[in-house]
UniProtKB/Swiss-Prot annotation:
Induction text: By sucrose.
Residue ranges annotated for the ABC transporter domain, each copy included: 14-257
Homology family: Belongs to the ABC transporter superfamily. ABCI family.
Keywords, sorted A to Z: ATP-binding, Cytoplasm, Nucleotide-binding, Transport
Region (Disordered): 263-295
Native species: Arabidopsis thaliana
The organism's taxonomic lineage, starting at the top: Eukaryota, Viridiplantae, Streptophyta, Embryophyta, Tracheophyta
Name of the protein in question: ABC transporter I family member 20
């Protein structure tokens, strides 16, 4: 019997509905009239889904993952992870149910309550075994999967070896939703293949959901269950992989390449037309201006500059009043 849309919504682990997002200026407010970076973006993913997020540089992939990871403020109804608001419900990340690996995480990791540069003189063993409350069996499995020598001194090993230690630490807690932002770039062929195999098993055996943004397609031909293509902050397509394979006879890499080439050709055509009409080839961005009050809330997703904690209890129900409207 076919699953209804209502049943899919009930069972969804990740739900983005009409997402709109604008980065603020230096004063914490997006410039008036600035174009949203993400606009009218909607996807739904369920348990066991492995979603590949693709797009050109600057398309908005990292921003989408950060919003899903609770790093940026948006209206509570726009982004739901495990049925909860990704930003307001800090229990999602503190419990390990929602895990984000990417961006600043690649340069520093939290160790013993402090931000520690991963290049410092410390052993892999101290970093990995310093994470409390971890299942020893899972820890041993990850050390084996990533082929880590726990005697490594992190200031002496290669970038790829340091990355393995970081990934191991990030995956120690069993997650329900995992967000990956190009974290395999330094891994060798074997380390990457073994990691992808482990992540696939996490989805198939534990029902985890993974969203993986990458430009490296080696070994991914049969890995994802879904693919999402974003361009200029807008959703271009979101399809199960079998649908993509039905419509394209090319490999995954060649299929994505054809999408990106078409996008680039159209962008070059637009720039040429702007130039022919006496306009700047590239659109200028508005910066360092300020808008306040209710219009600001509509533009800046409720950001408040300089606040690091909430002064009003109650989570998303107090969205309008809460001062917990900041960049995390």
């Amino acid at each position: 019997m076919a699953v209804t849309e209502e049943e899919k919504k009930r069972n969804s682990t990740v739900e983005i509905s009409g997402l709109r997002f604008t980065y603020p200026g230096i004063d914490g407010h997006p410039p008036p009239g600035s174009k949203p970076l993400i606009e009218d973006f909607s996807i739904t993913l369920n348990s066991s889904d492995r979603c590949l997020l693709v797009g050109s540089n600057g398309a908005g992939k990292t921003t989408i993952l950060k919003i899903l990871g609770g790093k940026h403020m948006v209206e509570p109804h726009m982004v739901r992870v495990l049925g909860r608001s990704a930003f307001h419900d800090t229990g999602l990340t503190s419990s390990g149910d929602l895990c984000y690996l990417g961006g600043e995480w690649r340069r520093d990791v939290a160790f013993a309550g402090f931000e520690v540069p991963i290049q410092m003189d410390i052993s892999a063993e101290k970093m990995i075994f310093g994470v409390a409350g971890i299942d020893p069996q899972r820890r041993d499995e990850l050390i084996k999967v990533l082929d880590i020598d726990i005697s490594w001194r992190l200031h002496k090993v290669s970038d790829g070896q340091r990355r393995r230690v970081q990934i191991c630490m990030g995956l120690l807690k069993p997650f329900k939703v995992l967000l990956l932002d190009e974290i395999t770039v330094d891994l060798d062929v074997l380390a990457r293949a073994d990691l992808l195999k482990f992540l696939r098993k996490e989805c198939e055996e534990r029902g985890a959901t993974i969203i993986y943004a990458t430009h490296i397609f080696d070994g991914l031909e049969d890995w994802p269950t879904h693919i999402v293509y974003v361009a200029n902050g807008k959703l271009q397509l979101a399809l199960p992989m079998e649908k993509v394979k039905e419509t394209s006879k090319k490999s995954l890499m060649r299929t994505v390449e054809s999408w990106l080439r078409k996008e680039r050709d159209e962008e070059r055509k637009r720039r040429k037309e702007r130039k022919a009409n006496g306009l700047p080839e590239f659109e200028t961005r508005t910066e360092e201006s300020r808008v306040t009050g209710d219009p600001a809330r509509m533009l800046n997703n409720g950001w408040a500059a300089g606040r690091l904690h909430s002064t009003v209890a109650g989570g998303e129900d107090n969205f309008v009043l809460s001062s917990n409207r900041v960049l995390r």
